């Protein structure tokens, strides 16, 4: 068998119906859309409506809730801090504060604070002051000979 000899099984495909092509076609004039109304117009669909079938958002159970006073933190990884210090965008001699991280472009916005995580290689001796940090990030900074000061531990949790 060759590629050009391949074909669909009989009845597997159906010829496309061209609608709105005159009354003799059986799908002319209204084109199967009925008379007037929202559903006869083009590009209109009622979102979430599944033709009377119970919609997906109602079939699934309600779960969880949104915390009303949720804190959103900007996340910074130690590996990126290391790269910015090596590139000269952050001053490794001075304490690295949240304002310094924003000024360097490492973080776009502080949001409710900055949280440091331990992803990446880190071996610089730095003093970092941030709102929150993971335990592994604190260990990594202290192992390198620096210090990581968490200014607001309650907010970071």
From Swiss-Prot:
Question: What are the alphabetically sorted keywords of the record?
Answer: Ribonucleoprotein, Ribosomal protein, RNA-binding, rRNA-binding
Q: HAMAP family this protein is in?
A: Ribosomal_uL15 (MF_01341)
Cross-referenced InterPro entries: Ribosomal_uL15, Ribosomal_uL15/eL18, Ribosomal_uL15/eL18_sf, Ribosomal_uL15_bac-type
Q: Name one GO cellular component term.
A: cytosolic large ribosomal subunit
Molecular function (GO) terms for this protein are: rRNA binding; structural constituent of ribosome
Gene3D superfamilies recorded for this chain? 3.100.10.10
- Gene Ontology BP annotations: translation
Query: What function does the entry list?
Result: Binds to the 23S rRNA.
Superkingdom, according to UniProt?
Bacteria
The answer, when asked if Transcription is one of the entry's keywords, is no
Q: Where is this region: Disordered?
A: 1-40
Name of protein: Large ribosomal subunit protein uL15
What family does the entry list?
Belongs to the universal ribosomal protein uL15 family.
Does the record's keyword annotation contain Ribosomal protein?
yes
Question: What is said about its interaction partners and assembly?
Answer: Part of the 50S ribosomal subunit.
The Gly residues compositionally biased stretches are 21-35
């Amino acid at each position: 068998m060759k590629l050009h000899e391949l074909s669909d099984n009989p009845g597997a495909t159906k010829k496309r119906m061209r609608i709105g092509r005159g009354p003799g076609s059986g799908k002319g004039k209204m084109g199967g859309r009925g008379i007037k109304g929202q559903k006869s117009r083009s590009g209109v669909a009622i979102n979430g409506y599944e033709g009377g079938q119970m919609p997906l958002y109602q079939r699934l159970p309600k779960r969880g809730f949104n915390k009303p006073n949720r804190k959103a933190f900007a996340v910074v990884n130690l590996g990126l801090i290391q790269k910015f210090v090596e590139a000269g965008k952050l001053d490794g001699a001075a304490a690295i504060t949240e304002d310094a991280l924003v000024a360097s472009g490492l973080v776009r916005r502080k949001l409710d604070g900055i949280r440091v995580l331990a992803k990446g290689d880190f071996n610089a001796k730095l003093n970092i002051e941030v709102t929150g940090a993971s335990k592994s990030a604190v260990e990594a900074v202290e192992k390198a000979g620096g210090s990581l000061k968490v200014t607001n531990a309650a907010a970071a949790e």
